[in-house]
């Protein structure tokens, strides 16, 4: 599936911020751009039709995901495809660079942890 231009541009911003964390590599997951730590994906461009264009999928536990969606539903959401997966979908245009950095840090810690609680 070809990425939309907005998704590529948004991921360039994500990559610029996210690669500042220790051990981060740029790769792909399911053919889309992703950031990984220790070989584990912590964020990617979601391609399932339940994800809106210009979104980012970030791994985190279910509790934190639900808190974010409740606090800022115009920024964070989930789709049917992602409901049972420990991640949140974020509308990149709604995030400042500081918010994006904090969000990526959450995903980075989640993926890097040896044991994950969900």
PLM region spans:
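Charge-dense, helix-prone N-terminal extensions
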Residues: 1-118
């Amino acid at each position: 599936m070809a990425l939309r231009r907005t998704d590529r541009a948004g991921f360039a911003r994500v990559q610029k911020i996210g690669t500042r964390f220790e051990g981060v590599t740029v790769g792909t997951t399911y053919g889309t751009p992703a950031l990984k730590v220790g070989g584990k994906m912590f964020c990617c461009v979601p391609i399932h039709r339940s994800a809106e264009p210009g979104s980012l999928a970030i791994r985190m536990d279910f509790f934190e995901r639900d808190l974010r969606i409740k606090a800022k539903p115009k920024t964070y959401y989930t789709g049917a495809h992602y409901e049972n997966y420990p991640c949140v979908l974020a509308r990149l245009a709604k995030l400042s660079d500081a918010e994006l950095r904090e969000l990526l840090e959450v995903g980075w810690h989640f993926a890097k942890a040896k044991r994950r609680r969900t």
